[in-house]
């Protein structure tokens, strides 16, 4: 066979370079985020020792993270440790969605403690998130499940598609505006002290998968709320702790452990966010048993949590407080409000309403997704109305507005929303959030100030 000519060799070389360039560009688009890779690396030994793969691999296969050939390659390794190592070698090469899908699979296979470990590490790594392009959309395709009024609709960029709006992969755009030195100097003397680094500890507890005899459904969209809040609190300067799918007893025990952490002594505030099904005065564990909110507040009161005495404590409750859907009333001579097209669901439990008293505590403020007796609305793709509004307001106005006033703005956003789910009880439904406060001073979060 004749040797290739110089021209042929040059052509082959160019084609090889083009192919390499294509592979490079594909990896740039499809590779795992560096923070996710670093998170897996930092927990590699623990994961290699503790992962239980038999069911986990099926979940990853279903999510198109691994192929049948990859599953066979992993299973061909001798011993669980070697199999786990092989999976950990593959994951960083399986695209930008692989980390989130892996975390979800851990949760679905009752390995939530490993997911918590990964998310806590990720929060520690992401001290400062780079700003993302963010603007507001004025029109949305009908296929989007739920939206704010058009002028409030967040999107990724000017050419965002409908998939980027409701794929549930996390907050579409989140950037907290920093407080200016001038604003801080003008307000800090009349407000709670908020200067510690971190500002305080934050706990985000999200129950999504329920078992037991209660008729409590999977909280589709709950993962979006969790991811959004973890990101928001991190950007506001908090050290975030995460918990998933806890029984009522586990919630009580872990909330108590969180309240007793020594770090509260040297920080200036505390945040607790609880996301679950609920009734008036209580929230459900994944076992269908109730944890009374009275008990939650008791754990952080002045008697039981002296480390937080005279410090502001913020609570956010995304759960129903009853099972009544607010049908709303016609507004006299009112403007036509844009509907919120969506796959609406309710966080109400399917049992008789339980009445529980809510105690008054000092230096606390608690935001509720809905009024007493009512159900809270949650979109199966975008997450709950309340958490979406809370995130929008806090990211935009924490720089120049105190928390109580921000919660008033959250109320205003929730008031404008209207469900869109033709043929269901949630079509044209309404929701009204509220808050109660025993704060004794103005509570400014002063994001980004003083500079670290």
Swiss-Prot record:
Pfam families: CARD, Peptidase_C14. The mature protease can process its own propeptide, but not that of other caspases. High level expression seen in the embryonic CNS, liver, lung, kidney, small intestine, and hair follicles of vibrissae. Moderate expression seen in the skin, oral mucosa, skeletal muscle, submandibular gland and thymus. In the adult, it is highly expressed in spleen, lung and kidney. Moderately in the brain, heart, testis, liver. Low levels in the thymus, skeletal muscle, ovary and gut. The modification N-acetylalanine is found at residue 2. GO terms for biological process: apoptotic signaling pathway; cellular response to mechanical stimulus; DNA damage response; DNA damage response, signal transduction by p53 class mediator; ectopic germ cell programmed cell death; extrinsic apoptotic signaling pathway in absence of ligand; luteolysis; negative regulation of apoptotic process. GO terms for cellular component: cytoplasm; endopeptidase complex; nucleolus; nucleus. Residues 327-336 have a biased composition (Basic and acidic residues). Residues 32-121 form the CARD domain. Residues 327-349 are annotated as: Disordered. SMART domains: CARD, CASc. InterPro entries: CARD, CASP2_CARD, Caspase-like_dom_sf, Caspase_cys_AS, Caspase_his_AS, DEATH-like_dom_sf, Pept_C14, Pept_C14_caspase. SUPFAM superfamilies: Caspase-like (SSF52129), DEATH domain (SSF47986). Keywords: Acetylation, Apoptosis, Hydrolase, Phosphoprotein, Protease, Thiol protease, Zymogen. The modification Phosphoserine is found at residues 157, 340. The keyword Hydrolase applies. It catalyses: Strict requirement for an Asp residue at P1, with 316-Asp being essential for proteolytic activity and has a preferred cleavage sequence of Val-Asp-Val-Ala-Asp-|-. Belongs to the peptidase C14A family. Heterotetramer that consists of two anti-parallel arranged heterodimers, each one formed by a p18 subunit and a p12 subunit. Forms a complex named the PIDDosome with PIDD1 and CRADD. Interacts with NOL3 (via CARD domain); inhibits CASP2 activity in a phosphorylation-dependent manner. The CARD domain mediates a direct interaction with CRADD. Involved in the activation cascade of caspases responsible for apoptosis execution. Might function by either activating some proteins required for cell death or inactivating proteins necessary for cell survival. Associates with PIDD1 and CRADD to form the PIDDosome, a complex that activates CASP2 and triggers apoptosis in response to genotoxic stress. This is Caspase-2. It comes from Mus musculus.
């Amino acid at each position: 066979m004749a040797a290739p000519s110089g021209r042929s060799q040059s052509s082959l070389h160019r084609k090889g370079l083009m192919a390499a360039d294509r592979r490079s560009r594909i990896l740039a688009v499809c590779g795992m985020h560096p923070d996710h890779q670093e998170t897996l690396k930092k927990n590699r030994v623990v994961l290699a020792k503790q992962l239980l793969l038999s069911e986990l691999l099926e979940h990853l296969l279903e999510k198109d993270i691994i192929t049948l050939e990859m599953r066979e390659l992993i299973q061909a390794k001798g011993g669980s440790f070697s199999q786990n190592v092989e999976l950990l070698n593959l994951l960083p090469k399986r695209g930008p969605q692989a980390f989130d899908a892996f975390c979800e699979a851990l949760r679905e296979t009752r390995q939530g403690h490993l997911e918590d470990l990964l998310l806590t590490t990720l929060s520690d790594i992401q001290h400062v998130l780079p700003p993302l392009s963010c603007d507001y959309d004025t029109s949305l395709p009908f296929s989007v499940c739920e939206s704010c009024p058009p002028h409030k609709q967040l999107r990724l960029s000017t050419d965002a598609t409908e998939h980027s709006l409701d794929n549930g992969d996390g907050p579409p755009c989140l950037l907290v505006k920093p407080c200016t030195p001038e604003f801080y100097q003008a307000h800090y003397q009349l407000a709670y002290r908020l200067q510690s680094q971190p500002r305080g500890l934050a706990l985000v507890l999200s129950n999504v998968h329920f078992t037991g005899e209660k008729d409590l459904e999977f909280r589709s969209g709950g993962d979006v709320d969790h991811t959004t809040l973890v990101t928001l609190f991190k950007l506001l300067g908090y050290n975030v702790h995460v918990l998933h799918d806890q029984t009522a007893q586990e919630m009580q025990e872990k909330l108590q452990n969180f309240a007793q952490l020594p770090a509260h002594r040297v920080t200036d505030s505390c945040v607790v966010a609880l996301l679950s099904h609920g009734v008036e005065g209580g929230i459900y564990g994944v076992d269908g048993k109730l944890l009374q909110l009275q008990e939650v507040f008791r754990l952080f009161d002045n008697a039981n949590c002296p480390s937080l005495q005279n410090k502001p404590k913020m609570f956010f409750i995304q759960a129903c407080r009853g099972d009544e859907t607010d049908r709303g009333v016609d507004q006299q001579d009112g403007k036509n409000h844009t509907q919120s097209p969506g796959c609406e669901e309710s966080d109400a439990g399917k049992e008789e309403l339980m009445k529980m008293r809510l105690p008054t505590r000092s230096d606390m403020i608690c935001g509720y997704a809905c009024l007493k007796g009512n159900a809270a609305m949650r979109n199966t793709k975008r997450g709950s109305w309340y958490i979406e509004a809370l995130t929008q307001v806090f990211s935009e106005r924490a720089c120049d507005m105190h928390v109580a006033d921000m919660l008033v703005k959250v109320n205003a956003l929730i008031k404008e929303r209207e469900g869109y789910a033709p043929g269901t009880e949630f079509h044209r439904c309404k929701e009204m959030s509220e808050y109660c406060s025993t704060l004794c001073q103005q509570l400014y979060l002063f994001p980004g100030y003083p500079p670290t």
